């Protein structure tokens, strides 16, 4: 599976059961990135996406158990460490801001198992700068 996650400067993902931030330009970027591949997410995350813009949108609260090689998984509020051995690529979108957080990204990207292979910046709607970092094993 290919994981997509949005993180603040401290690796935060959620605070008080809510996403830290969102950006409609980012949603369009994710739709283009996924193309005609399957994109999995839970019901909470699906609320922010336009199902018509993503051809193969799959919504299931157990989506990390359903995804197979080559499938994308948009993750906001799930622990990923238990699934790390099945993850082939990680795509991180960074907000370049610090938000309150009580749930953090739980895979160590600096520990040597993952190497950054691409980094791109773009301007969002509500964020002056969003970075996309792609990590491979």
Model-derived features with residue positions:
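Enzymes that bind and transform nitrogen-containing heteroaromatic metabolites
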Residues: 1-137
């Amino acid at each position: 599976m290919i994981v997509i996650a949005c993180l603040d400067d401290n690796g935060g993902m959620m605070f008080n059961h809510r996403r830290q931030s969102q950006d409609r330009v980012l949603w369009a970027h994710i739709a283009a990135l996924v193309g005609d591949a399957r994109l999995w997410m839970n019901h909470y995350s699906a609320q922010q996406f336009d199902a018509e813009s993503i051809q193969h949108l799959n919504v299931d609260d157990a989506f990390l158990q359903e995804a197979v090689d080559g499938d994308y998984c948009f993750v906001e509020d799930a622990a990923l460490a238990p699934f790390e051995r099945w993850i082939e690529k990680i795509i991180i979108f960074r907000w370049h801001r610090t938000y309150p957080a009580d749930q953090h990204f739980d895979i160590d990207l600096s520990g040597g198992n993952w190497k950054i292979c691409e980094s791109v910046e773009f301007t969002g709607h509500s964020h002056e700068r969003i970075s996309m970092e792609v990590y491979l094993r």
